[in-house]
């Protein structure tokens, strides 16, 4: 195989197919992956992925597209740069970055944004292809670049990526080659642009914002139109007149573009095919702001009078007849809102003339109003909006606008009239006429023939232009309307004649009737005429507007004789004025007379740069004709309309300077001319004429020629200044100062021309005059007269504008000196704001770019800045002044940044010495939300950036004393730290932030050198300074903008390549500075532990290795000082918690910390053991903290609670009270979020254990986190108790609440003697007692959960927990929630503990099953009648032991009687703490397993059955309204052998000689079982007796059957096992049931077990059901309480039926056959009594001599009868709507005097006596451990 060789040209490639690597050396690729190629061999490359450089390997060449690159070598590294254009590279990078975000948006289901990004990416991909094609014309490429950059910037903004700053050409600015100030301004501009862009994107009206912004920013615009085709069935030649039209004003606003179309459907001139292009130019912003603009096309047919006429020979040809119009609304295209593309074709539908009185102009209005069907006829055009005038667009769009493109100008002047734009166009519009028919029978077909005639009547050739693109003609013939009395032509033509001919020409209009027949038409002559002169007698042109002309009649030959009509009036108003002396038709001369019945009107518009319509202006322009009126005309100029003046700007200025030049020896007109010049300059300064600035500039440079004007201008100006300085009145001075810029331009230009003409003659005199002129200005500035204040402000504002020009003819240094005097002569506190603004203008001038000028000007500027910045002024003024100050300083720094360093050294030094500290203090005192803060910070950054090493050294030496230097360094460090912590720039200004960081880093290191030199020695050591340094450095290293790992790959590389990893540099500096401290280190322990820890946690390996040893140095330092390092240890534990919770730290850090510290300790044996202990401590804490952080974002709050408790225990074990309490409250908050009020109370209770009932002040570490006010132990404990009691109340843990209430009551009664609080407390206790008795508390289920496998976090891995379920929570629901938390986990279907293979497997395995709580005995309830409401609470609370029973088969199985071989395997669990507690679950700390024999199982089952019977008897005795069905089911299931088989199976299994013989040790158990069977008979008898009383008639047969079965059963049992007797239950009083916790527990009313378990536990399982039942023992479930009405006397609490869980809890009353399958079927919630006690639930210790040891404490002391309980019964008929979950139920309270109380006592005494006889026999079998208290 060929060897691998280094890749030469093939260095950079992109994967174009997916490649799946098959082995280790092969690198898998996806389409689009960018690879760096290192070596090549045959068909393979070796390299790595650009995004993941660690992924290296080989890949086939055919899968890679090679990209051209250039290799740039920097130091020892090669930087490979793609060869494609930068913008294409940027698009590529952007697509990578957006692509990643695009996928994330999809995952996050953000559909709208996902589609938006997708659309933008498609656009960028398409534009990238166009960029790379290299085929775009220059203008299109420029526009495309703008679109691309705009789209990228917009996309980055909405995706919250970094802002990209660009230059004017759209290229990304390089911070290395851009000044800080320029970079800052570029960020500001980019932000503003994007903000505007986003506004436009949100507005659907302006989609093409880039074009819109370009259009709106230019004063002149053009519309390019290309006529592609004209589709229309005419059959004759046609003329197409296209123009722009304003429909609101109903006026045409441009010249017509004429296209002559042939009858065959082609242009008449075939070379014009595909070349019909026109540009409508001179459009200004006013035109763009019109509401509507239409492109209209008026079509005139040229041919016969009527198209329908046949016989072409007889018809008149060549008539211009109206045919139709085409109209298109182009408003959006004009304004740049709609797409403007020269390739997109637009169809303009054609609308024909339908009647003769449909004038083309009138038809436009109709077409606009109605959108009719054109039938496919119309005009096809493409159009594009172009920016600029005709000269500009010829340069910018050469492919569109070439020599063949026709130019159609605007009707009127453009907004800017350039000096070279000589124009003399007069637009004549034929408006309308009204012609009498006289002797004709029909109305005439009038044709107007217009021509331009000289004085002698001869027609001027080629003077009329019908439309742009057409040749000039001698005469114009109008459209002919057939037999219309009042034709309205509205046809516009242009008259263009030389200016010198204007005075002698006039327009002549001939009117002729045109006949449709050629023969008649030849005989027709002109029947009338009109004329009008274009110039008036006073030399002005005809006024724009409408003109009613006189119609002259007479001899047609005379009409061509000018002498015949020129003496007659041409306007109708002239005739009307003479009407008193002349008759209506008598005005005639030479055969022509005025027709009073005929009317003809025209309108004119003069667009001439040479002819004016103003008499005053004309007088000035022609001043030589009447020199005696010169003074008057000069004075009149000020009242001439400004528009007229600027229109003739060049001629007016020429006239003024000619007057000045021709009177050079006299000063007679100097002031008048000067004032006139000032007036004109002032006009141009007006906003209305601001665009004429360019005209004036052009005039001065190209047309101005008055070489002596400068002398006169300077003289008059100095006179004005001197007059004003003396406080005398000088009215024009303010206008003069405002016009100062152009006055000096004229002065300088005049002097330049003079100097060129006379080769520098009189230079000294000129400079002296200029110096005296500036001295006059300075004298004005010194003046103290009130009248001069405004003038001084004006001078400050306008003086800088003259510098550019003065500098050309005057010594720059001298000029600078004059300016220096100009500013220094103003009093220090006067006009400061204006001075600063003026100085800013000077700084931006060319003058300031010269070193010698800066030497003079900079000191005065810095002095002014310093004074102004240090002033204390009111806020509003301060903001303005500071704004001007920072602008000025920015301008100075900007200028200096682009100069050679050698020429700016002293200037930077000047700024540094004078202003650095002032700027720093301004930043420090300025609020971070101040509008100018970012400007000042940028300014400060720029100063520091431009300071060299020598500057730093020099600046340090400027401080006179050490304390001053320390103050400066402290200020700077504090400011830097504050700016790093609160960045003044927006978050997306990445470039600006990084440049600031780079500058700050250099400054910090420079100042650190100063600290080493001056403040390290013991005598000079400055602790606070060093402390500030370390805190600043750590703040710098840990700031978000430097954490590269958090950034995208593109951003990571961008920062690393441009700025490097600044964290390493500062980190190494911190290390070095620490080790230099020597003996001073101890001062920084423990203060610096936290910051150093924060630094070491940065995930950068080299940095960690360099800085972690500092920890050991700290430990060693403290150990040597005090013999231990407790301070360090305490601080590290405190800070570590905070840092890891904040997201810092990882497994690698933990390992690195351990290895480095142990390595360091190995070199110091005396401290090694302590270090090892410390490392173990920190490692344990880190593990727990990382676990905690790992679950903080987890949806599972359970995991968060577990980790919180782990940390609690850690801090408790290590006596960290403050941290312990902090996490207590975190745990409390988590519980409250989950409504775990009980657990929240227990959590808060832990805090109270740290407090005493004393009045001493609480230490800070035992206060609640964030608590402000100091409290005593008693106050805090009392407050906490009240909160906890509230939580216990919400969690229905009233027993606990009462306990705390009692403790509080004791304090109120015995310690603080606050009886008012005591009374409230006792009321609260009473309420809790009442709640215990009246409010239902559902019993929670408990679940064992095992987490097996290495996939779980350490706090769960291979551990078992017991969970306390929520109210009514089923195992299925709990398990589903559990699996949701661990979606990748596998559910285990077995309940046995898994083997090591599962525990060590990499996956996750979850085991979940229900367990039963085991109660501990409560001694205080022994031998006392306790209500079941009290007892039931303890059945599922305060429990720490649980068990799970599972049936197993042993020995031979008898298919007819499986009980004999049915053994129970019982697993017992002991948790770390009792439940409920601070968690809803606790880890199992001990597990054991026992086995229960079939006989013991039978005893348990019989005990359960007896308990159920007794419980139900109690229920029915207590409530006579209960339904009978449940009792029927229970009794029938036992007495009828057909249903369940009764206890016959026990007899077959155990009561045999064979069993007794084989199991002699079970004799006592057999006796016990027989005793239970015997006791069942009286219980059944009592139940049947109750049933007999309650049974309805329809169930009487059922009862009789059941009674018969019972008699048979009774006989059999009493015969076999003896007789048992009970007292008569009829005598028992209806009251609250009570329990005796002695030998047996009496009937219970509320059974919590029945509340929260499934109804699936039969009392006596069959062979089919036993396995399932014992594997998951459950009890019936009830959803909610049902209150008893207040008036009821029922003593029990009832349950309301659930509507939602009918399928699980509601079963109908079953027949006997169905009842055979179960001893108790589930019924409707209202009709079912549910057992809450299955004795198998409560057994936790294996039987030795008695089954009782397996029972709950309530039944463990019972010798012969098992513990019995009754479940809660539902009461039918109660209104569920009134139920409240917390509603207390009313119970009948029985007084001691009740006469039935004795009956109850007798019953209780009976049970005591009956059971006492057995207690001696069984008592010895009860383990002592079970009799202990809770």
Curated annotation (Swiss-Prot):
* Chain ranges of the DOCKER domain: 1211-1622
Q: Show the CDD domains listed in the entry.
A: DHR2_DOCK2, SH3_DOCK2_A
Q: Which GO terms describe its molecular function?
A: GTPase activator activity; guanyl-nucleotide exchange factor activity; small GTPase binding; T cell receptor binding
GO cellular component, as recorded: cytoplasm; cytoskeleton; cytosol; extracellular exosome; extracellular region; membrane; plasma membrane; specific granule lumen
Query: What is an example of a Pfam family matching this protein?
Result: DHR-2_Lobe_B
Mention one GO biological process in which this protein takes part, according to its record. cell migration
Keyword annotations for this protein, in alphabetical order, are: Acetylation, Cytoplasm, Cytoskeleton, Disease variant, Guanine-nucleotide releasing factor, Membrane, Phosphoprotein, SH3 domain
Q: Which residues form the C2 DOCK-type domain?
A: 423-607
Q: Where is this region: Disordered?
A: 1651-1704
Keyword set includes Phosphoprotein: yes
Q: Which residues are in the SH3 domain?
A: 8-69
Query: Which positions does the record annotate as the modified residue N6-acetyllysine?
Result: 304, 738
- Which InterPro entries does this one have? ARM-type_fold (IPR016024), C2_DOCK-type_domain (IPR027007), C2_domain_sf (IPR035892), DHR2_DOCK2 (IPR026799), DOCK (IPR026791), DOCK_C_lobe_A (IPR043161), DOCK_C_lobe_C (IPR043162), DOCK_N (IPR032376)
On subunit structure and binding partners, the annotation says:
Homodimer. Interacts with RAC1 and RAC2. Interacts with CRKL and VAV. Interacts with CD3Z.
What role does it play? Involved in cytoskeletal rearrangements required for lymphocyte migration in response of chemokines. Activates RAC1 and RAC2, but not CDC42, by functioning as a guanine nucleotide exchange factor (GEF), which exchanges bound GDP for free GTP. May also participate in IL2 transcriptional activation via the activation of RAC2.
- Name of the featured protein: Dedicator of cytokinesis protein 2
Please give the organism. Answer: Homo sapiens (Human)
Taxonomy of origin reads: Eukaryota, Metazoa, Chordata, Craniata, Vertebrata
